[in-house]
Design a protein with these regions (language model features):
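Surface-exposed, low-hydrophobicity beta-strand/loop segments enriched in small/polar/acidic residues
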Residues: 1-24, 57-59, 63-76, 92, ...
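Autoprocessing Asn-cyclization modules and mimics
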Residues: 22-94
Length: 166
């Protein structure tokens, strides 16, 4: 179960396919590729031989979030300066990479959500740690959600300014 006093947080970008990533940027940079599903950054070395001494590795399943707020998953590390991304990919520009949250159901602590903007007729659709699809209705502004979550769905979610606390 999540702690009552979280020590980390990440802004939730609702996605129907990607779990909320692990809080904490592992690296960031500027994508110069003109192809949405290719991330190219001459200032990076994505290979494990370079990243492992820094305390992390980048691999398929990790998550890229663009400065525009688009979330996508890394499919593979192709070279020192290039990653292949799963659709939708991202446009050229600034990005952050986070560790993916590929959870085994029931074996992770998950997230407590804080909903900044809700209100009457709002919907927050979530996936619980056990994989259940739950829609919460009429979620008030500035609300904590009392269920452990691994994903915030894009489909039908109308709440915004959501934080995942861990």
């Amino acid at each position: 179960m999540a702690q009552n006093q979280p020590s980390s947080a990440i802004a939730v970008i609702p996605s129907d396919t990607i779990n909320i990533p692990v809080p904490g940027i592992i690296t960031s940079g500027t994508n110069t590729s003109g192809v949405a599903t290719t991330l190219t950054d001459a200032g990076q070395d994505f290979r494990n031989s370079a990243t492992n001494p820094n305390g992390y590795n980048i691999s398929g399943g990790d998550v890229v979030i663009s400065a525009a707020g688009v979330i996508c998953e890394i499919a593979s590390v192709d070279s020192a300066t290039q990653l292949t991304l799963l659709a939708p990919g991202i446009a050229a520009g600034a990005y952050d990479i986070y560790k993916g949250n590929y959870q085994i159901q029931g074996e992770s602590e998950g997230f407590t959500l804080f909903v900044g903007t809700g209100g009457p007729a709002t919907v927050l659709r979530i996936q619980t740690l056990e994989g259940q699809d739950v829609s919460l209705l009429n979620v008030p502004d500035s609300s904590f959600i009392p269920i452990q979550v691994q994903r915030g769905w894009a489909a039908t979610t109308t709440c915004s300014n959501i934080l995942a606390l861990q």
